[in-house]
Amino acid sequence: MSIGGALWSGLKAWVTPPDRHALVREAKARAAALLPPGETVVDGHTVEPGERVPHPPKPYRVDAFGIRPTAGDRVLNGAERVELALDRVNPFNAALDAWDRRGEDRSAQWHGGWQSAAGRLAAALRPRTEKKYLSVLLLTGVGLHVVRVQLSSDGKKVAGAVEHACAVARQDITWLRDRKDVRHGTHEIGFADGSWVTVFLPLGGWGTLVEQFPRRLRHTDPMP
């Protein structure tokens, strides 16, 4: 391959966005492989915390993959956050964002202490890390699991570590409410201890997962 061809190939790979659906499929497979032998996955999907679910205080926050962020990681990711902030203050982008969030409920997105089931799930979704990763929500016959799958530095492929982050017994999951009035893919999960937390299921394909939850509620239904 010529130097020009090599440069073009590298540039093309750099600007080509990742195949998100393929990335999710691989992350789900890697996450499922981490479960105890004999525990069968009913369904799963990548998951993110609701936007206004708070970061856990220091005693409840963990270092993802057992690695404390380095100064170099913080500099690189800080640059990405600056770029994102500049993008958001662009008047055109701000108008689009406001339209997308029209009618959004600005109230709290969780309830319960950090030691509650909802608190443990929320903390698992907000670890301390500068690495790129996906959180995978797996529902099995035994419980609900959150597994973190590390991605490559460009976020385009699964690479590196996989770790179990949280588990809740299936009998402790009492309801799930669809909050499509907030954002398509947003759901509230309620637990037997009275706690609940908002999560976001990105991309499509999560319908079969939510069908497995007990007592599914619409956004027009009152909070249990």
Q: Where are each of the predicted segments found?
A:
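Low-complexity intrinsically disordered segments
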Residues: 2-41, 45-46, 162-224
